[in-house]
Every structure is written in C-alpha cells, then in structure tokens.
Amino acid sequence: MQSSKSSLAALTLGAIGVVYGDIGTSVLYAVKEVFGSGHVPFTQSNVYGILSIFFWTLTVIVSLKYVVLVLRADNHGEGGLVAMLALASQAVKDKPRLRSALLAVGIFGTSLFYGDGVITPAISVLSAIEGLEVVSPHFKKYVIPITLVVLFCLFAVQKRGTGGIGRFFGPITLVWFASIALLGLAHILGHPEILWALSPHHALGFMFANPGTSFIILGAVVLCVTGAEALYADLGHFGKRPIRLAWFGVAMPALTLNYFGQGALLLAEPGAVRNPFYMMAPDWALIPLVVLATMATVIASQALITGAFSVTKQVIQLGYLPRLGIQHTSVRDTGQIYMPLVNWGLFVAIVLAVVMFRSSSNLAAAYGIAVTLDMLITTTLTFFVIRYGWGYPLALCVAATGCFAVVDLAFFASNLLKLFQGGWFPLMIGGIVFALMMTWKEGRRLLNVKLRADALDLKDFLASVFTNPPTRVEGTAVFLTAGTGAVPNALLHNLKHNKVLHQQNLFVTVHNHETPWIGLDRRLQIESLGHDCWQVVIHYGFKNDLDLPRALALLRGRGCDIEPMSTSYFLSRDTVIPTIGSGMAPWREKLFAQMHHNASGAADFLHLPSNAVVELGSKIEI
C-alpha cells in the first residue's frame, strides 16, 4: 500500500514537470497580451470579466474536455493525436471513405504540432528573459542574444539525453507553481474582492456587453491553455490518475491564484500592464524569479522537444515519413531517443521565429491558429471514437463533444484574425510537414504497386529454383521484403551474381499496425515454404522499438534456429526515378525521390549488425 502511494506521488511529481510545464509558464504572457492589446479599458467590471473568461477557459477546455473526457479515450494506455487517430481509424475501418478523410485530418493535426512546437519554446523562453527589462531597461538589448544562447544550449545537450537531469524537472516545476501561487496570493489578499470573478456571470456579462471585443481577445485568451494537448499526449508516460491529481491538486489552483493576483495588481496599478507577472514580485525577488522562470520555460521546451522525437518516430512507423536517424540515449529506457534532423530542424525554425518576431508580444500574434485547429481536430476525432468505437448513442456523442466543438471553433475563428500578424508562420510549417507526410505516404503506395506488379510469386519461384538447386552454403540469409509472397530483388541479385543459396532462408516482412503496442506473444507469424525456407511476418505497434534480430530470436524452438554469428541480412536499396505518368504531380515525384534517397538505411532503423548486412541496389520508375 505504501509502495503504491509513493509510486503515485512520484508519477504525479513527474507529471507536474513534463505535462504542465508549458501551461504553467503561460502566466508569463497571457494576461499581458489581453490587457496590453488596448482593446480592454481598465475598469473593475472589465478586469473581473477577463479573469472570469480565463478561469472558465481553463475549466472548460482543460478540466472538462481534456482531463475528464479526452483522457478516457486511451489507445491501450497511450495518448496523443497519433494514438487518437489510430483509435478513430480503427473505429471506422468498415467505412473506407470516412476513414481516409479522418486519416488526412489527423495527419494534418499531427503536422500542426510541429508549427506549435516552434512557437511555444520561442515565446516561453523569450518571455522569461524579458523579465530582465523589468529589472532595468538597459537589459533590453540583451534579451534576444540571451534567449538564443539558452535555446542553443537546450538543443545542444539533447544528444546526451535528459535521463540524468530529468529527475529534477518535477521538483523545479513544483517550486515554480508554488512561487506563482504565492505571488498571486499576496496580491489577492490585498484585494480579496477579486475572487468574485470566479462567478461565470462576469464572463457572460463581459461577452454580452462587448461582443466584438470579446471575439477579438479570445485570440489572446487562448494563451492561457498553451500546452493543454500535453495532458493527453503524455498519458502513456504517467497514466490518468497522476495527470488528474497534478492538475486539480497543483496546476489549476496555482494558475488561478496567479491570474487573479495579476488582475488584482492591474486594478491597483494599471501601469503594471507592461509586464504584470514580473511586477507582482518585490524588487529583491526579480533576478531569482527570472532565473526560475527561465528554468521552467526550458523544462517546458524540453518536454516539447522530447514529444517531437516521439511523435516523429510514431509517424515514421505508421508510414508517413521516411526513416530518420534515431539514437537511443538510455540503455534502460528505450523511449529516450534523439533524432538529429528533428532536433536541429526545430532549432533553426525556433531561432528564425525569435529573430523575426523579436518579442513575446509579437510571437503571441503567431500563436493560436495551429493549436486551436489541433484542439478542434482532437474534438472531432473524439466524437468518432465514442460514436463508432464505444458505440454510444448519437445524441449523447453530440452532447459530449458538441459544446467543446463550439468553444474550439470560437477560439479558432478569433485566432484567424491574427493570420497576417504572424499566424501564417506555424501554419506554413504545419503545411510543409503535411505536404511531406502525404507525399511520402502516396509515394510509398505507388512504389509498392510497382513492386507488386513486377514481382514474381515466391512459392512458384522457389519451386522452380529447387528443380535444379544451386549450391547451398552454411548459415542463414534474411531477405527483407515489402510484402509477403513476392520474391525480393536481393534474392534475385544474389542468385544471379553469387549463384548460391544459404542453408536457411528467411523472407521477412515488417508490418506496422495502428495500435501502440504489440506483445511478444503476437510478434511473429511463420510459414514453412519447404527446403529450409520460411516466410516470416513481424508485427509491431507504432510505439514498439523495432529490433529485427531480437524478434527473430523468438523463432528458436519453432523449427528455425538462428545463430547470430552466421546470419546475413540482404536488403534491397532501391533508387526511385520520377517519370511522367499517372502517378503524382511531377514536383511531388521529385520530392519523393529525394526523400527516398535521403532516408536512413533500414539496417540502422531495424538494429541490424552492420558487419552482417549486404545491400543490393536496383532502380524503380514511378
């Protein structure tokens, strides 16, 4: 009992650091952007109205939508948009057109994650460093250089892994939440009447009295829910109960106290609007607060970078991106990975955002469109999961998701007003990633169609080969094939040039599924083809670690014993040649050919021993 309690406490502390770091640092800029826009005059009723909108936005979007509803839609314990997409796709698998539409929508939502992933670290770290301007205006010219140095250090340490320092994320973020709660409480005690803003009638009254202004400021209010998607994305790491405990026990109370404390400060000192968060603190605490805020924003950014690695790996295994280089940074935790291309690609985009927009206020204009569209997509996918996956009545499904869809649409529509102020930037990044993903998926489909059309039947081919069998050599040959039942090009090349066949021959197909995990008991399918030849299908979920030698070791005792020292892996390295035809648009064919050329080798991706791999090339026109 004591052990389970300590485990729950540890998971809850971990969730505070990883899940809520992003939303916890939104206090740095959310209130400033709403009141600093100039759309809202400083009157008591307006301040009460805005604070009420903040509180009920957190309640409806985070507490009710994500913590209560969306967390229930887990995919074998896993969360995130990719897991939700797989769940929705499986729920409507008997409706091919609807399934195709949902897959496109879900992949677009996943692409937008990268757009959001550029803005969030930029605005978080920049807003933390901007606290130096409150200490002294002379520090203003150093804000951007310091921000860039902090970001560079953050991305430079990724290849070393974060296992060692990761244990401090929870405690540091807990100190952050305690600090912002105390800052807010100190000002609330001076103006306790500010707590009347908890009543929803203040939010409704403000909206009815100022419909136009309300619609405009929703684009800034959305800043208070930055990182809400992380609640669901990190479900597999922590579980539902720790995430819910961390939200209702720590994050939500601390955020509420701080936002209301900032409101109390603005009522007393309207001039504090230039940076209400830092101006809540006494002068002696400013420098320590800037340091703590920087640490908190770095932790929030770290969680997003780790999420980008994880999502990219999942998308690759679902077949929407080519294989990329993956390095494991921990021998104990296979989930801790480093992807150089993703890491430095994100860094370049974030630096570009900081240099282009130059302040957290300007970046706030860029934030919102991508994340609110992602929220709307999550709501849409949730509807299809509970309607077709869980089989709930249509009326109940509409009631459960309809109100959230209306809220998401309102926030999205408001953020569209910021399209030309900077909202185009994350949309552009998301659009580029989406084009890459869809081009790769369609290119692979066309490539497989071409390979199947040209392929010989494996059983017929082996039957003809063994009518006049070639010389057999000791050892095992493993031939990787895209689909079962077809002769791999590597086998044809081997017979043509070497004129030998190994004593044992395995024709292996790796099949990735739209489910997060597939256990060892369902890992292998094996079919004997005679003459010590086998057709092997290896099944993986999109979160499983692909390790071919380890999977093939499971064949022991099933008629096929593999000795690692005498096993060779034969791979086909295809060169794609774009042609004018009925495939994709010419620019997409050229893009696919380039992506295919630059893809990481299958040997590294499948953990094959480099000294046992033989690659044989061929050219394929699409």
Curated annotation (Swiss-Prot):
Subcellular localization(s) per the UniProt record: Cell inner membrane
Keyword Translocase: no
One Pfam family linked to the record: K_trans
GO CC field: plasma membrane
Membrane topology: Multi-pass membrane protein
Catalytic activity: K(+)(in) + H(+)(in) = K(+)(out) + H(+)(out)
Keywords: Cell inner membrane, Cell membrane, Ion transport, Membrane, Potassium, Potassium transport, Symport, Transmembrane, Transmembrane helix, Transport
InterPro entries, per the entry: K+_transporter, K_trans_C, K_trans_N, Kup
GO molecular function: potassium ion transmembrane transporter activity; symporter activity
Transmembrane region(s): 8-28, 50-70, 103-123, 137-157, 168-188, 203-223, 247-267, 285-305, 337-357, 366-386, 393-413, 419-439
Function: Transport of potassium into the cell. Likely operates as a K(+):H(+) symporter.
Similarity annotation: Belongs to the HAK/KUP transporter (TC 2.A.72) family.
Protein name listed in UniProt: Probable potassium transport system protein Kup
Organism per entry: Verminephrobacter eiseniae (strain EF01-2)
Upper classification of the organism: Bacteria, Pseudomonadati, Pseudomonadota, Betaproteobacteria, Burkholderiales
